[in-house]
Structure formats: C-alpha cells, structure tokens
Amino acid sequence: MKTQGLELETVIDIKHKPVSFTGGLEFESLTYTVTKKKKVDGKWSNEDVDLLHDITGYAPKGCITAVMGPSGAGKSTLLDGLAGRIASGSLKGKVSLDGNSVNASLIKRTSAYIMQEDRLFPMLTVYETLMFAADFRLGPLSAVDKRQRVEKLIEQLGLSSSRNTYIGDEGTRGVSGGERRRVSIGVDIIHGPSLLFLDEPTSGLDSTSALSVIEKLHDIARNGSTVILTIHQPSSRIQLLLDHLIILARGQLMFQGSLKDVGHHLNRMGRKIPKGENPIENLIDVIQEYDQCDFVGVEVLAEFARTGMKPPLLSDMEEIISYTNSIAPSPSPLHRGSKYEEKSQDFSYSSQISRRSLNDEFDHSIRSPYNNTPMSWSASNSAAFLKFTPSRLKNENKVQKPPSHASPGIYTYSSEILPATPTPHSSDYVVDENDYLTPTNSSQEHLGPKFANSYIGETWILMRRNFTNIRRTPELFLSRLMVLTFMGVMMATMFHNPKNTLQGITNRLSFFIFTVCLFFFSSNDAVPAFIQERFIFIRETSHNAYRASCYTIASLITHMPFLALQALAYAAIVWFALELRGPFIYFFLVLFISLLSTNSFVVFVSSIVPNYILGYAAVIAFTALFFLFCGYFLSSEDIPLYWRWMNKVSTMTYPYEGLLMNEYQTNETFGSNDGVSITGFDILKSLHIGTEEIKKRNNVLIMLGWAVLYRILFYIILRFASKNQRS
C-alpha cells in the first residue's frame, strides 16, 4: 500500500479494510519496587520486593492489548504504571507514546482509565450521566453538538433501550451490570481519548455481556485509539478480539505477541498444546508449573521471552540436578523479592544442555516492531525505533517492515465510533531523535488547556448535577427537615412558659444546649453519601474532568439553601413559641452557621476515612468531645488548664455562647437567689461568657471561620491526598 510515496506494509485486514499498526504506547525496563516488612527469626526486617521487574514491551495503536497472567502476576500494577497512577519516583523505566517519552501528567491528559468498580451516581439516567460527562470533557462544543455526540455514543454502545433508565444501585432498580459497564466506558471515552486503560472490564459480567463490552472496545480501538486492558480467563470468542497479548508472572514478562504466536512460543519451549486445549490457558498452566517448581522459577521463562534462551524441561530436572551437584554451585542472582532468592540452582546448565542460539530458533516477531534486536531498548537502536512512529514517516522514504502480528479472526468494523483525539505526537509534530526521550514544552502546548471548562463553567456544571441528585434523593433532605420541625414542636411544648426561678434558668440553659447538639448531630447521616461521592470525584478528576476547588465550592453553594431552610423551620417554631429574647435574625444565623459548620466538618471527615463505618465513628467521637468541652458541663474557667484549649477548638462552644448572649444580654430579671434578683448579665457572668455586644458578632465570625477552615481542609485532602495512585 502506498501513502504519499511511503510504503506501508504492516497492516491488518479488518473486513478487507487495512489499518496501520504504526505508532502506539511503548515501555522500557519498567521496574516498581516496594518495601515490605518480613519477620525472620522473630525479628522484623524490611525487604524490597519487585512488583514489576524490567518489563519492556509495546501496545500497538488501533489494537486491543490484553495484559494477562496468574493471580498476583502484576497485571493491574503494570496498567497503573502505564496510566501514570504510580507516584513519581517509585516507578523506574521509560514510557513512550508514538516515539516520544511522556510523563504521568501527559499520559493523564491523553488517556482515560476505567476502574473495575463502576463509580456512577445511581439516581442519574444513562443519558444524564453521559451528558454531564460531555459537559465536563467537551467544554468548547455547543450544547447541540454535545447532545448529538451523546446520542451517537448511546447508540454505538447499545444503550438506546436504557437511555432514560436510572443507573441504579442496591436500593434502586436500574440498568444491568453489562449496561452499567458500558456507561462507565462511555463516560471516559466521550472526549475520544487516544489511550484507554481498563482494569478487568469483564469482571462480574456474564459471557454475553462480557463479549458485548469487548466488541465495543474493539470498535473503539479500530478508530485509532490504543486500548490496554487487564483480563482474567477470557472466553474463546473474546480471545479472537484481542490483537496483542502481554502475559506476566511474578512481575516479569513471560510472553508478548498475538494469539497465534502463543502456540509457536510453546513449541519453541518444547511444549506441545494438547488437541482442543486453549493456547493461553495452556501457557499460563506451564508458567504456574515453573512457578511451583522447587528448583527453577518463572525467571527462566522471562529469560526465554527476553533472549530466546530455552528453559529446561521440568521432566529433565533429575538430570539437571545430577549435573549441577557434580560441579561447584554458583547460584544465579534473582530479582529482589522473588521467593526463589535462596535457591542454589546453578542456571549455567543451560549452556551444557539446552542453550539455543538467539537467532536459530527464537522468533523475535513477538517483540515490538520498534525494537528488532535481542537486547532491550538500547540507545543505539533509537533511530530504528523512531522509524515506525507517525512523526518520522514524513522524513523517511521507506518504512522498514515490522514483523506481522495480526490477530486471527474477522472483525466487524464500525466507521461511526467516535474518533480519538489527536495526541501531542500526531503527524504535524516532528520529533528529533536526539531529544525524543524528554517531553518538550511544545508537546504540552499541543494539547491545549488542562481543563475543558472555565472555573465558573465547571462550578455551574457541578452545581446542576448536585441539584439533580438532591432532587432525585429528597429523603436525605426531607428527613432532616422533618426531624428538625418535629423536634422544634416538641421543644416548644416542653419548655413553654419557663418560671422565673433558678430551676427555670437551668431549664432554659438545657434547651439551648440541646438545640446546639441537635443541629450538630443532624448532619451525621450524610457520611455515606459524601463517601460515595468522593469515590466518583477520584475517578473523574484522575484525568482532569474538573478542578478540586470547583467541586468544593459547588458542594458548598448547593447545600447552603437547604441548610438555611432547615434552620429557618426550627427557628421560626421555637422562637415565637418560647418568646425568646434578642434579635430573631441573630438566632437564625447562629443555627444556620452551626449547620454549615457541622456540614463542613462531616465532609472533611468523609474525605479522610476509607468507609462510612469509620466515618460515623469519627464524626460521633469528635462531636461528643465538642459537646463535653463546650462550656455547659464546666464553664471555660472551671475546665482544667491542660484541657482548656479544647474549649477553644470545640465548634459547639461558639453557637452555645452565642445563643446565651442573644437571650441574656439584658438587665431583665430571670429569677432570684436568697432575695437577690438575677439579671441576664448575672447569668452570663456566672458562666464566664462575655456581656459585650461585640462578643456576639465575634462568635458569629469565629463560627464562620471554623466552617471555612473545614472546607479548606476538605479541599486540601481532595487536591493532594485523594488520588487513586500507588505510592
């Protein structure tokens, strides 16, 4: 096939439509080491363990690359490493996109990562979920264009029949598991990412739903995206849709190539596939045999995949043991963390028994077309590496023919799948082979702004979604409103017409402290909702859907009118029924800011804890501490000096004192003691509460300060700590 004078020979026929394999994601010598504690002879010591060890490979553009292997092989770890979800400095090696080295930030801006769990709002419909995703990701497009894109995507994903169905959850009937997974995929491909990472996309699905999901991913790949997924035990029909396989074991590369190469790979190892047996399952069984062997491990298979050095047959191990016992042992160093570190097996037997020439029988076609040498990714072959990237096609008269690695089977080609967004390494971006290992500023500029919408635009979209969710789940808001209204009526009837006695004063103080406690405990039921929303936030912001600051502000603005209505309902009932003194507006403000403060505290705690059980425990524990030190049981002067600081940090102190000042900053008499009248000022002085008018204003400002502080802490946690990233 000739294209602008260039000869492109590496193509795959999809219903007789050639698709070039030029370009893709390449990775070199990826190593990820973690430190684990190990107990030896009763003592704990640190041990370095390689979760990934010197993995080099590639994922062709326009293809589905499946990462497979036994449990604990490092599949998800490799996926996280390629997707930039491992903290900077922890992962060693290079990742290149179309011949240019890229960092984690650049990968996130050109890719989408679909988690194994479907994190979606249950009370949004399929259309609304995808429409909000379009609003976040396709900012510059008009509303009409966004709707058209969403409608087209719904049709392509086979979701037309469930377009207006709620996503649903355990308590709400919604779409099926397969449809939910396709919605998750749609949310992350609405903007046409060049790279698509999926962690176990078929997990928990029946065979039909799993096949449907992979078919949609196949169509997405055929339109120019690089699709990389982890998968466990795919069916034979799904295997036919997988173009490129990467098989791992204990963090090492065991095999790389197409499905048809698996049998050839096993034959070169001296293993034959039994008739009718699945080649992939047979290879994984062989890997596990070596892994469970007491004398050799999967390292010999990794060496075979890397250099072509044939591993020993396990049936010949008696001969090998006899031979190695006749010579001085010199154990081969194994990578850190392997369970075979203490084995004394001498792998030099390979040179005597089963060493093969690297070029005689080893088929290097299973390797990346960008690297045709037996050694991995040396600087000397960087020029050859770049010849197969789109940016080099303009300058080469002829492209070398990479080995064929077409997948078997006939596929259905869909020309209407949304095209991938251009990567920063498209054909108009020329790369110098001398500096391709360092991402340039121009590649960053080529991508445009980091976020699709303006600050105000993001906040408005988030507010609209929040209001929609609140409208669909009125029980959370209405339950609090009903509780506060009911308790207001109860308090009004219980504390009506207090007597002008010391007991009457005590009763009125009890009313105020109960009111404060009621408002502080009323938001505890929101912990599960905030934790669920946090997981969705992590998924959406991992690839720059919106800013954490916009999310924080939108959440605050959305809840303010509902909190104000709750405070107003309670204040209006008890104020007039109990004939309270002082300005009504101040009484309302204290209650409203109390709700605002406790709401901010709850969302802050929810951003830290891993689950709602710990969230409930933490919120209740801290609220109890605030209650203990608010000044009701012991005045601020009577609290021991070493605990007095708790009175200042207790967020209940200020609304409690504020309500008392609003009621008792007066010379009116509220009772007598031994014939001496007790005025409102006397009550405040006995409780060591200020009698100045300015103290009322200061208390409100301090309460606002606590609410703002908790929101700032909430933002900091979201911005810097709530990242779905390995350390």
Curated annotation (Swiss-Prot):
Membrane-spanning residues: 476-496, 511-531, 560-580, 584-604, 613-633, 700-720
Extracellular side: 497-510, 581-583, 634-699
Induction pattern: Accumulates in root cortical cells containing arbuscules upon arbuscular mycorrhizal (AM) symbiosis with Glomus versiforme.
Keywords of this entry: ATP-binding, Cell membrane, Glycoprotein, Hydrolase, Membrane, Nucleotide-binding, Translocase, Transmembrane, Transmembrane helix, Transport
Top-level EC class: translocase
Gene Ontology BP annotations: arbuscular mycorrhizal association; response to symbiotic fungus; transmembrane transport
Segments forming domain ABC transporter: 25-275
EC number: 7.6.2.-
GO cellular component: membrane; periarbuscular membrane; plasma membrane
Name of the protein in its database record: ABC transporter G family member STR2
Lineage, uppermost ranks: Eukaryota, Viridiplantae, Streptophyta, Embryophyta, Tracheophyta
